[in-house]
Amino acid sequence: MNKLLYTLAFCLFSQSVVWAGDIWVSPTGNDNDEGTLEAPFQTIEKAIKQAREWRRLQTPEVNGGIYIHLADGIYYQEKTLFIRPEDSGTSQSPTVIEADGEAVISGGVQISGWKPFTDFEPRLPNQTKGKIWVAEAPSVGNRHLEFRQMWVNDRKAQRASQFADGVMERMINFNVQDETITIPTPLIQGLEDAPLLEMIVHQRWAIAILRVRSMETKGDSTVVRFHEPESHLEFSHPWPQPVIGGEKGNSSFCLVNDLSLLDEPGEWYQEYPSGRIYYYPRENEDMNQATVIVPALENLVFVDGSLERPVQYVKFKNVRFEHTAWNRPSSEGHVTLQGGFRLLDAYKLATPGLPEKATLENQAWIARPEAAIRVKGSNNIDFDGCTFQHMGATGVDYEWAVTNSTINSSCFTDIGGTAILMGAFPDGGFETHVPFKPINEKELCSDILVQDNLITNVTNEDWGCVGIGAGYVKNVTISHNEVSHVNYSGICVGWGWTLLESGMKNNCIEANYVHHFAQRLYDAGGLYTLSYQPGSIMRNNRIEQLTDAPYATNERAFYIYFDEATDGYTVENNWCPEERFDSNQPGPNNVWKINGPRVDEYIKLNAGIRKP
C-alpha cells in the first residue's frame, strides 16, 4: 500500500513540474562533449545547435525553456553567430543565453610578438625614434588582417593623426566644380607620398572620411584631391557640405593614417600590404605584457527571421559583447547624410519638387551602417543586463519587422557609431525623403522598450551618429536611459523630413537623462525628432551640458530640436537649464507645455536610470 501511494505521488509530482533544458559552455570545453556542467561545450554555436535539435525533436528539455549557461572567459568568434527561426522559443519555453559570471563574446584577435622597432625609417618623426614597437598582423583565412580599430589593455588606441585627438584645423576652400579641398600646408613633410592617407572632414551635423589621392602644395596652401567613389559623393551632395565663411569660421579637417603622423603616445599605424603594425606605447604600457586586440568581425550576432517565419523568444542575459570592426571606409571612404547613414548617391535638384514634397531641392539614397548585433524579422528578442563595448560601428540594431522586444539595464560604451538603432531607414533604391509606408504594416518595428540603459562615449568613430536612434517606428518607448558624451544628438526619433502619414505613431521619449552632447558637431539636439508621429509624447526628461562644439561654424544646437516636419508630439515637463529649443518647419499638431528650468525638481532628479 505504501509503495502504491509513493508511486502515485511521484507521478502526480512529475506531471506538475516543468523541466528546463540546461546547456553549459566554457572556453575550455569541447564541442565533442555532452554540454553538461561537468563536460561543457566550447562554442556557443554548438550550444545553440543542441537547443535547435531539442526543439526539432520536441524532447522533454524544451518544456520549461532552454538555458545556455556561459562560463567565465572570452568566446572568440571566428564567424557571426547565426540565429534563425528554428532557434525560436515560446513564451512558456524561451531560449536564454546567459552568463553565469564574466562571459565575453568577442570578434577580436590578439596581436602578439611585439618588438622594439630599431630599423631606419625616414617617415617616422624624429622625436619618436626608439619609442616605436612593431608586430606583424595575424593571418585570417589566407590574408593579413586589416583593421581600423585597436585596443591596448582594454583601452582604445588612436590611428596616427595630424593633430592630438579632437583637434582640427580650418580649411581654406571647398571647390565643388574641381572636387578639391584647399587646406593650410601641413608642417609635416612627405604627406603627398603617403599611400593610405585619409582626411576627416567636419561638415555641420556629419563627417566625411575621404581617402587622399593627391596633394599639390602652393606655398602656404595645399590642394587635396580624393579617390572615388567618395569624391563624387562629397562634392555632389548638398546636405551637409562643409561651410566656407560661417559665423564662427570655415569648416575643419584633420589628416590621419600615415607613419609620418605617428607622433603621440597611444597612436598606431598599419602598413599595407605587409600588414605590419607600428605602435607608440603610452606611459606605463609594457608591450612585452600588454594585451592588444584588433577586430576580425563586423557582426557578432545575426538574428534573421521573416514575416512568415520570425525568430521568437530569444534572450541574452548578462553577456558582454566586444571587439567589432568597421572597415568599409578603407576601401570606399565614408560620406553620410545624417545619423551615420552613408550616401549611395545624392545631388541637388535644378528644379525642386517630388510628388510627395513639392519644395524638395535635393534627393538622396542611403545605406545602413554596419552593426555588431543585427536583428530582423523577429519578436521578443531581448537583451538584459548586457554590456556592449569596443565596437567599430552600431551596437545593437533592430533593423526590420522587430516587435515586442526589450533592451534593458545594459551598458554601451566605446562604440564607434550609434549605441542602439531601430526601425526602417529606407535604403538602397528607396529615396530617403519619400515616406515609408509599407503595404504590410508588420514591416515596421513596433512595441520596443529601451529602458534603464547607460550609453556613454559612443559615436567615437563616426561623430554624426547618435546615442539612441529610431527611424520609422511605432509604439516605441525610450525611457529612463542615461545618454552622455556623444558627438552629435542624444536621442533621435523619426526619419523622412515629411508631414505625410507613414505609420510612425505613438512613440514615447520619457524620463531620460541626456548630457554632454553635441561635443564635436552641431545642428544637434539632446532630444531630436523628424516627421509626422501622431500620438507621440516627450516628457519628464532631463537635458543639460550642451557642449560648445569647438569647430562648429554656427550656434545651432538645442536641448530639444524639432527638425523638419516634426508633428504630433506633446512636449511637457522636460527639464533643461534654459529654454533653448528649436522647431524647423514643424507641423501644426505639436503641443508644448511647461519645459525648461521651471520644471519641478522632482522630475529632474528622477530622470535617468532607476535603482534596481
Describe every region a protein language model picked out.
Residues W24-G377, D382, G428-I439:
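Extracellular polysaccharide-degrading/modifying enzymes targeting complex plant/algal/animal polysaccharides
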Residues M150, R155, Q162-A164, N327, ...:
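Extracellular beta-rich repeat passengers
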Residues T7-S16:
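Bacterial N-terminal signal peptides
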Residues Q312-H323, T359, N379-H390, V402-G417, ...:
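Right-handed parallel beta-helix
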Residues M1-Y6:
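Bacterial N-terminal signal peptides that target proteins for export
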